[in-house]
Amino acid sequence: QGTDVSKLDYDTLVLCEDPGTTLIEEFTHKKTYNNMNRQLLTTKEGLKKATRKYAMKLRSDLILTSDNFLEYFDKFEARGNNYNLFKHKILTDVLFTRYNIKTGKFENRVIIPFHISDWWLFGLKEDLNTYFMDTELVKEPEFTRYFNLEDNREKLSPYGRARFKFAPEQYFGYSCFARNFDDIYMEDAADYSEELMEKFRQALVNNFIILEFKQSGIYLNKYPCSKNEKFSGDQYIGLYNFWRYENEYKKYCDNTYEITTKDSFFENEKLGYSKLRVYKHISKLTDSSTTCTAKLEQLFIGIPISAMCYLIDVLKEQLGTNKEQK
């Protein structure tokens, strides 16, 4: 409410009372806010106005280059026996549906259960209702500053400087499945386990289909990597990309399924991680929003150093293989 919509072209206008926003972190030239309550409220109010069998929830700044995503809606129909919730699987994006994440406080990558992309979702309206409508708005600022509260300061959040109880994507995913399955529980984002991750893996592949840009035709100008997810750099290793989704589908849903993709980044994760660092610097170099100074840094520092590190890792790997053969 109160937004100037005089220049917008729309069929139905949904105005909501603003639940407000909360500051996540502040830098010299930038402030980052948690707008999760705004997103959740507008999504729920939008679904109330939707009148057709199918619905699509998406960011207003996403660009649809085609309707290719519809070709996948009736694929991957098989399901496993556990955590079947939706009437039909929901389509969503690889960015940022996470398997694990790398943060500075942890030596190894950390699993992130129920972190499902909130960029866009397409499916039966009744299934999107199941996913969102009973999810409650959170109490702020306690939610966003959760790991700064006295009782939680000793906990290790997987999200680094961000101190929220859950990332928005994880809050939506976890809330939905926790209220529908009694054996799913997380106190906060630091409360994860291999057992819980196993439940999430089954829930995800039984209820969602994860697509990359080349399958969906949907991207976001704000993130140039959304046209080629490998340009997200080393975090690509931790995403539920289409290759990982196909493998999970074969494991949990249909062991006769023939995988159609091949991803060299996962055949050797260490080398894949190193190679993706090069991709990340190339992405920054080609990003139109990158300053000239930053482009020069990528060209003469970032790319050469990351490429050299990758070549060193390749040589180490090759030397190790030769020793084993001898």
Locate the predicted segments by residue:
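Active-site-proximal specificity loops/subdomain of glycosyltransferases
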Residues: 2-49
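Short aromatic/hydrophobic "clamp" motif used to bind/position activated sugar donors
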Residues: 55
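Catalytic core and acceptor-binding pocket of nucleotide-sugar-dependent glycosyltransferases
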Residues: 64-258
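Short acidic donor-binding/metal-coordinating loop in glycosyltransferase active sites
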Residues: 58-62
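Membrane-proximal basic amphipathic "stem/tether" segments
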Residues: 239-326
